[in-house]
Structures are given as C-alpha cells and as structure tokens.
Amino acid sequence: MHERYPVNGGLAQLIVDQFPTGFMGYGIDVGASDGFSVNTTWVLEKHHRWTILSVEPNPEFHADLVKERAWVEKCACDSKPAESKTFHINLDNHEAYSALRPAMDYIEREQHEGIKTNKWGRIQVKVRTIDQLLEKWAFPRLDLLCIDVEGNEIDVLKGCDLKKWKPEMIILESWDKGTADEYLKQFGYTRVARHVYNDCYLLGVPEDK
C-alpha cells in the first residue's frame, strides 16, 4: 500500500484562473498515479466538473485510480504506440521516478538528497499516443494537457497533434525548468509560470508577458 498525499490545489487553482468562471473543460492527465496524491486534475474533476482522462501504466495505482476518477486508461504514453514495452518502476518511490526511460541523473539526485535507492522493477505495459487516447474516448476538444512522466515529456508531446488539438494550457512536471520551451514554442506556447516542479504553458501568449 503506497502512502497518499494531498492534492495539488495550488496548481489546480492556477489552471482554473486561466478559464472563464464556471468553465467545464476537457483534459488529459498522463502519469496520474493514484488520481489523488499531489494530483493537479482531481480538483478540476471533482469541484469544477471538468472531464478528465487519467492515464497511468503502473498497476499498483490502478485500484485507487478507478475509485477516484471517472475516466481511466491503463497504459503508458509515448511518441509511438506499442502493444508491449518495458516500464521501469523505482521500488523506493513509484510515483516520483518510474518511467519508460528513467533519467540517468535520478540516482545522482537521490544520492545528493541522501535517499537509498537503486532498486528497480520492470513490467510490460501497453503504450498509446495521446492522439489515440483522445480519439478512443471521443474528446470533442482538449483544453488542458498535463504530463508527469519523469523526463519523457517531449516524447509524450510528440504523440499529440498540438496543431489539431490546440489545448489552451499545458502543464509539464519537470525537475529542471524550461526543458520543453523550444519544442512548444513552435506550436505557439509560452511558459508563463513555474509552480514547484511544474512548468505551465499557455497558447498564444506573448513571450514578454
């Protein structure tokens, strides 16, 4: 049984503030874990009546996720789909480090923070692109794209046709600030805020704003 933590209400409010009062949007949350702990979209779904697709490949979180959230997809996301791909699970911290391709600097970060790690499990998971999931769940539009995939953000973004969907806001969890700035700039996105480890991007906002 993993430990649960409070939802990320501060970031949820930042998102809500970008839309008209009472707006009920459509969003996808890639890397949703249990759907509650430090989760950005829980508040949107439960208190603002947004429609959110919660995506998570780790089976440990699945039972809690389906209890917490209305729409759930058990898979990983990447630039291309696959019926079976190795997913690496950090046995010391399933939520913060597990990924299709774990970043090599995690071990260095853990050593710096005094955390004993180097314990990894591996499972096979289904992989889908964001485009495939939006089509499967018949999204009429996409207002919010949230991605928390431990260093694989660009690969996941490449699986979403941003020119077609044009989400108003994109939230990327990233240890380092601005790692997706250049990639998203070509689609008209500007990073407007940094909330703890989350980069927040808006569509069509001038860079100097």
What are these regions (language model features)?
Residues 1-209:
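Phosphate/nucleotide-binding beta-alpha loop and adjacent structural elements of enzyme active sites
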